[in-house]
Design a protein with these regions (language model features):
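Pore-lining transmembrane helices
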Residues: 10-20, 24-264
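Short, small-residue-biased leader/transition segments that mark boundaries at the very start
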Residues: 1-6
Length: 264
């Protein structure tokens, strides 16, 4: 009985220490996700305007509602649904390792699977929808731009050729500006996520290494709890990386928009 009381006392202290560091990691993950989302909300209207000026009116019209909805809704899903699921799983691991008789392993695994599945569904749906609509609208814009240039060149007397060249010049310069803004956007996202990701990777490594080192000399429940904390940090890290990946792909697609202009 004394051994059980002593274990639970040590376990309670360990839980408090692990919870403190895990809450810090949650705060870091939320700040990064919200920071990237705020930056995308600021830069996207500029990029959409440049796409429209470069002749990609259909692309701008179709991408804009998808993009703005994604920038608002996806980070909110991560912050209000996925991260709380990770937190619940983290807490349940403590309860699971408190007793040797009564276990909830399957419930913990189920929550972990839900977290991974939701992220996978969001990433796949977002990238597939964005790619399909981008390809379709690119074809429409290419035909529309060539038709406009042909009509101006052939049906406006004397100055038609000059107007046609002016349209191409404005579209080309808009394309250059858009590509520069997209490149800057990619670099800013890297700067936003770099330090937090390094911090979370190091914390995960510390917990995994700690679990490996104390395993020969400690109760298996303590080892399991420390390892589970590392697993929860991996899930948090996946949230930050998946949101960043989606916005990376978004900027890359927008950077490639309007390339049909080059060469007339």
């Amino acid at each position: 009985e004394f051994r059980r009381v002593l274990f639970r006392s040590c376990y309670a202290v360990m839980v408090m220490l692990l919870s403190k560091s895990f809450l810090i990691s949650i705060s870091v993950a939320k700040d990064v996700i919200n920071g990237v989302a705020d930056f995308m909300a600021a830069i996207l209207p500029v990029l959409v305007t440049m796409i429209a000026l470069a002749g990609g009116v259909t692309q701008a019209a179709t991408i804009d509602p998808i993009v703005m909805a994604a920038v608002v809704i996806i980070p909110r899903i991560y912050v209000t649904v996925i991260i709380p699921l990770i937190m619940v799983g983290f807490v349940l691991q403590f309860a699971n390792n408190l007793s040797e008789e009564h276990k909830i392993d399957n419930l913990c695994k189920l929550l972990k699977q839900w977290t991974v599945w939701i992220q996978g569904i969001i990433i796949t749906s977002f990238i597939a929808l964005l790619t399909i609509r981008g390809i379709t609208s690119t074809t429409i814009d290419a035909v529309a731009l060539k038709t406009t240039k042909f009509a101006v060149d052939n049906f406006i007397p004397i100055v038609g050729k000059a107007f046609s060249d002016a349209i191409t010049s404005v579209a080309g310069y808009s394309l250059i500006i858009k590509n520069a803004i997209s490149g800057i956007g990619l670099m800013v996202i890297i700067l936003i996520i770099l330090y937090p990701i390094i911090k979370m990777v190091l914390m995960t490594f510390i917990y995994k290494m700690s679990a490996a080192l104390v395993e020969p000399i400690s109760d298996k429940r303590i080892t399991s709890t420390i390892a589970a904390t590392g697993d929860s940090l991996v899930l948090l890290l996946s949230c930050v990386l998946s949101v960043s990946l989606m916005f990376f792909v978004l900027l890359a697609i927008m950077a490639s928009a309007g390339k049909f202009i080059v060469g007339g």
